[in-house]
UniProtKB/Swiss-Prot annotation:
Changing E604K: Does not affect ability to promote axonal degeneration following injury. The active site is at E642. Homooctamer; forms an octameric ring via SAM domains. Interacts with TICAM1/TRIF and thereby interferes with TICAM1/TRIF function. Interacts with MAPK10/JNK3 and SDC2 (via cytoplasmic domain). Changing R14A: Loss in ability to localize to mitochondria and reduction in apoptotic activity. It catalyses: NAD(+) + H2O = ADP-D-ribose + nicotinamide + H(+); NAD(+) = cyclic ADP-beta-D-ribose + nicotinamide + H(+); NADP(+) + H2O = ADP-D-ribose 2'-phosphate + nicotinamide + H(+). GO terms for cellular component: axon; cell surface; cytoplasm; cytosol; dendrite; extrinsic component of synaptic membrane; glutamatergic synapse; microtubule. It is found in: Cytoplasm; Cell projection, Axon; Cell projection, Dendrite; Synapse. This is NAD(+) hydrolase SARM1. Residues 1-27 form a transit peptide. Coiled coil: none annotated. Keywords: Cell projection, Cytoplasm, Differentiation, Hydrolase, Immunity, Innate immunity, Mitochondrion, NAD, Neurogenesis, Phosphoprotein, Repeat, Synapse, Transit peptide. SUPFAM superfamilies: ARM repeat (SSF48371), SAM/Pointed domain (SSF47769), Toll/Interleukin receptor TIR domain (SSF52200).
Length: 724
């Protein structure tokens, strides 16, 4: 009872600490035991009231471990000697409780739990768990997997990678029941973090296949593990594993996870995974075609990182936030050229900054190089979402927030150049730049010789640092005042780094129509493009542009006239609608599903046009799907509008029924009652592939319209429409 109250008090304190200001609170207090009688948890025994925790927390960690380890060793000894399945289960539960309580400790939980996890391995407990995972009793396997998931710190992952991957993969092949699947997905989530080689082994041996299979389930905890596992696989697996993930359609299977309307943590983890995949240039286009990437920026813009941080702190498996290695993997997202990656990276680091500031461990952000990347986002970003997140993270870390840089660099006056020099750390050269009256035009055309001779930058390394910053500025700059043919965007479509050459080209009087006539020598001597590979790529693309005048806009795939339009009720049918989208895409159909259900204007026209252009109309009938259509005689409801449009255009309507109860026909508006003449297919979550095969038979040229429920033309297994 005391343990429960104390843990609840910890969570409540964390909530208020992260919700509001913490006056003078740079440290966290670790409470002593309850002043009343009774036995407190092992970390509180013997205390004398609140104690301050230093950032290192060495003394507190050591004291906690000295009290905890004897109890852990006793529990492990009992587990080793347990005879029957019931005794084994009791032993596993006792060890699990000790480890879980350690993870929940504020500020020092990671270090204390690390000590317990190491002790379990050194005492033979990890090897014992791997044996118990092969036990014939299902309950024993479930409990052993649950404990193993909790103790997979770095050294324990090493051990499992050496001797236990086969055991884990055999469990993954079982796929059922969901209680076991949850823990196995959690184990895979941790093992994908071990190394690039381990990721490759897991992917090759079926670990990724198991995670992707579980993405079609509905259990929130399982889906969250799947999203985190896919994110870790993408972050730690390297480009070869990322290619394999895309080949196995991981980007598509992330869609229902990112589209979930019930679990924001799940959506964010899924968005992180797909954003990481999109940073791989080899598979970027395939990831874009999945449709999942389009969900990232709107989701990030709609959420509060402070609330997300509180959710992480309140969950036992994420209460300590990410470790330094995991945080280091997020920094490249900030430096990516993709908006989605920058947004999700800034969001996660902002949330982690809130957690680490509460723990007094903000120094880790300097150690991993995140501070400069966050400052660059603030300085160079024209996107309000990622800029606001980066500013918030910097404030939480106690760092100075730089001023945004004006993008119209060619029009800069001397004062803007001075401000930029100060922000990039070159204040000592402000005077020489001022004396030479360097404005935006001169800055963009500055050569290394001029920098050394006229501006006094003698050190070669310093000049390299300066040109690295100048290249970033050139890439970021807006050239619309001097670039009439939009050469900058065309160069950026070849490679985002090529935008840096825009001003040199337009200053020579070049535009897109003349570029193919230029020689490589002219690009070098007149335009200042010193890298030969870049010159060759630009000239090759310019000559190809003669046959394709707008290469940067490229023709879109057949998404303008989709094969299937999916209509669904947002509050009850989004999960099934997103699953249908993935299944149909994997079978070669192009699918339209509206993401945000915007309320007016051009979006309404686009939505109606999408219904009219689609060959088939799939209607998801989830609980209460038609309730808002009743008495909607003005046809203001979205689902009502979509159904009426599909009926009037003679579309092949395929209703999919999932827990739907039919209303009486007369309560529906007359203009949509004809939908009752179509047979529906009952959705089965357990037999999704079989259900999809039935749906595809309807979509491939076989109309689902059938006014007689028992007609010979009705699909086997289809459910007749309307009440009976």
């Amino acid at each position: 009872m005391v343990l429960t109250l104390l843990l609840s008090a910890y969570k409540l304190c964390r909530f208020f600490a992260m919700s509001g200001p913490r006056p003078g609170a740079e440290r966290l207090a670790v409470p002593g035991p309850d002043g009343g009688g009774g036995t407190g948890p092992w970390w509180a025994a013997g205390g004398r009231g609140p104690r301050e925790v230093s950032p290192g927390a060495g003394t507190e960690v050591q004291d906690a471990l000295e009290r905890a380890l004897p109890e852990l060793q006793q529990a492990l000894s009992a587990l080793k000697q347990a005879g029957g399945a019931r005794a084994v289960g009791a032993g596993l539960a006792e060890v699990f409780q000790l480890v879980e309580e350690a993870w929940l400790l504020p500020a020092v939980g990671r270090e204390v739990a690390q000590g317990l996890c190491d002790a379990i391995r050194l005492d033979g407990g990890l090897d014992l768990l791997l044996r118990l995972l092969q036990a014939p009793e299902l309950e024993t396997r479930v409990q052993a997997a649950r404990l193993l998931e909790q103790i997979l710190v770095a050294e324990n992952r090493d051990r499992v990678a050496r001797i236990g991957l086969g055991v884990i993969l055999n469990l993954a092949k079982e796929r059922e029941p969901v209680e076991l699947a949850r823990s196995v997905a959690g184990i895979l989530e941790h093992m994908f973090k071990h190394s690039e080689e381990t990721c490759q082994r897991l992917v090759a041996a079926g670990g990724l296949d198991a995670v992707l299979y579980w993405c079609r389930r509905t259990d929130p905890a399982l889906l969250r593990h799947c999203a985190l596992a896919l994110g870790n696989c993408a972050l730690h697996g390297g480009q070869a594993v990322q290619r394999r993930m895309v080949e196995k359609r991981a980007a598509e299977w992330l869609f229902p996870l990112a589209f979930s309307k019930e679990d924001e943590l799940l959506r964010l983890h899924a968005c992180l995974a797909v954003a990481v995949l999109a940073t791989n240039k080899e598979v970027e286009r395939e990831v874009e075609r999945s449709g999942t990437l389009a969900l990232v920026e709107p989701l990030v813009a709609s959420l509060d990182p402070g609330r997300f941080a509180r959710c992480l702190v309140d969950a036992s498996d994420t209460s300590q936030g990410r470790g330094p290695d995991d945080l280091q993997r997020l920094v490249p997202l900030l430096d990516s050229n993709r908006l989605e990656a920058q947004c999700i990276g800034a969001f996660y680091l902002c949330a982690e900054a809130a957690i680490k500031s509460l723990q007094g461990k903000t120094k880790v952000f300097s150690d991993i190089g995140a501070i400069q990347s966050l400052k660059r986002l603030v300085s160079y970003s024209t996107n309000g979402t990622k800029s606001a997140l980066a500013k918030r993270a910097l404030r939480l870390l106690g760092e100075e927030v730089p001023r945004p840089i004006l993008p119209s660099v060619p029009s800069w006056k001397e004062a803007e150049v001075q401000t930029w020099l100060q922000q990039i750390g070159f204040s000592k050269y402000c005077e020489s730049f001022r004396e030479q009256q360097v404005d935006g035009d001169l800055l963009l055309r500055l050569t290394e010789e001029e920098l050394q001779t006229d501006l006094g930058m003698k050190s070669g390394i310093t000049r390299k640092r300066f040109f690295r910053e100048l290249t970033e500025l050139k890439t970021f700059a807006n050239y619309s005042t001097c670039d009439r043919s939009n050469l900058a965007d065309w160069l950026g479509s070849l490679d985002p780094r090529f935008r840096q050459y825009t001003y040199g080209l337009v200053s020579c009087g070049l535009d897109r129509s003349l570029l193919h006539r230029v020689s490589e020598q002219q690009l070098l001597e007149d335009c200042g493009i010193h890298l030969g590979v870049h010159r060759a790529r630009i000239l090759t693309a310019a000559r190809e542009m003669l046959h394709s005048p707008l290469p940067c806009t490229g023709g879109k795939p057949s998404g303008d006239t989709p094969d299937v339009f999916i209509s669904y009720r947002r509050n009850s049918g989004s999960q099934l609608a997103s699953l249908l989208k993935v299944h149909l895409q994997l079978h070669g159909f192009s699918v339209f599903i509206d993401v945000e259900k915007l309320e007016a204007g051009k979006f309404e026209d686009k939505l109606i046009q999408s219904v009219m252009g689609a060959r088939n109309f799939v209607l998801v009938l989830s609980p209460g799907a038609l309730d808002k259509c009743m008495q909607d005689h003005d046809c203001k409801d979205w689902v009502h509008k979509e159904i009426v449009t599909a009926l009037s255009c003679g579309k092949n309507i395929v209703p999919i029924i999932d827990g739907f109860e039919w209303p009486e026909p007369q309560v529906l508006p007359e203009d949509m009652q004809a939908v009752l003449t179509f047979n529906g297919i009952k959705w089965s979550h357990e037999y999704q592939e079989a259900t999809i095969e039935k749906i595809i038979r309807f979509l491939q040229g076989r109309s689902s319209r059938d006014s007689s429920a028992g007609s010979d033309t009705s699909l086997e297994g289809a459910a007749p429409m309307g009440p009976t």
